[in-house]
Amino acid sequence: MSVDGRASIMHRLADLIESNVDDISLIECLDMGMRHESLRNRVIPRGARNFRSYADIAKEYKPRKWHSNTTKNEIQRMPSGISVIITPWNAPFMLSTWKCAPALAAGNSVILKPAEWSPLSASLLGDLIDEAGFPAGVFNIVQGIGEEVGAILVSDPNVNRVSFTGSPEAARHIGKSAAENITPFTGELGGKSPLIIFPDVDLEVAVAKAVGQFDDSGQICLAGTRLLVHSSIKKEFLNRFLELTAEQKLGSSFDDETEITPMIHPDHLQSVAGFVDRARINGDKVLCGGRVFKDDKLWYEPTLIEPVSNQSEVVQKEIFGPVLTLQTFDTESEAIELANSTEYGLAGMLYTKNRGIAERVGRAIRAGTVWVNCFLIRDLTAPFGGFGLSGIGREGGDYGIDFHSDLKTFQILDDSLSE
């Protein structure tokens, strides 16, 4: 199929996603608990944007051509074959579209393995892909337990690419299996992102952004879970933070006024609670929250912890729940040192009115994406990925399609061919 043909079907699929937003949002909300309003108005529509963006990027691609010495040269981008896509349980529909779209745009066949905790929307995506007109066999879904089904997929020698989003622990196993067949592998592996607040900010805005990191009960890989606040404003910041956090409503994902939604699974809630329990034993100070909400099995109170040291587990490990840490700094260099002091490097945020501070600190943060005075604003043509333990490879724009492609250098000797 031509690039134009693929792009046309991908735009048709985007139309179908937009016309089925209500159904997809309902299924996704029931399956993994994200707030229905967010799904309906932002997250699921982003899935349509993913397909439109990659359809257009593929159409606009122009192979590089040049002449050197005695040859005409061209770089050709070709489908690599079969792409295995393994997605996580948080925002599964959107992340499935984000990871499958570049593979389909490249001309590959796709095998999607969704997370077992939130499998439903993947099947709906398959139905929409069939309705859009993709040829039979181009898009395939395999449901099952990751350690069993996923292991078989990534170790198959017929697979040409593996793209994974999930934990570093799982990525190590997947990477080793893929390496046996020299299968290219890319992984987005989570984060422990700093949110740095300088003393010149509008404190109301900064506090609101900090409390906003509890969205989706903290089950967002990009969340700024490490609050780094200038020591001169710590007291005022903390007072306002605690006041606003106390106002957060824990409730149903179908209630538009809910701020703290249920967690994905009781097992995950227990994992989050374990981090907080160990923090108390370690001597870290729990400033708010720190317990299951009304003995429920799915809600955990929004929690802020002041660690005894930067080496505390709650500072260094990804918790993936409504748990933030609070640390202070006095100088730019100290803020940078704290920001870069974990093994992760997915994202970073900083709030300041000073351009010099923004430029210096922003450039010094080792992370795949750095936001200044904003959060979660995405340009889908920009590269997305992390430093260190946050991943390997990049998605987004041509970077995503290139991963799922084989690049060939094609050279013709001057005056060696007749018409």
Model-identified regions with their sequence ranges:
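N-terminal Rossmann-like NAD(P)+-binding subdomain of aldehyde/semialdehyde dehydrogenases
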Residues: 1-71
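Residues at or immediately preceding the N-termini of alpha-helices
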Residues: 3, 21, 203, 234, ...
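Residue-level signal for inorganic ion chemistry
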Residues: 6, 28, 51, 107, ...
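Generic secondary-structure signature for well-ordered alpha-helical cores
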Residues: 15-22, 33, 37, 56, ...
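Rossmann-like NAD(P) dinucleotide-binding subdomain of oxidoreductase/dehydrogenase enzymes
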Residues: 18, 62-205, 329
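Hydrophobic packing residues within well-ordered alpha-helices of enzyme cores
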Residues: 51, 122-125, 153, 174, ...
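Conserved C-terminal structural/oligomerization subdomain of aldehyde/semialdehyde dehydrogenase
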Residues: 159, 196, 249, 276, ...
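ALDH superfamily catalytic-core signature
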Residues: 169-309, 372, 418-419
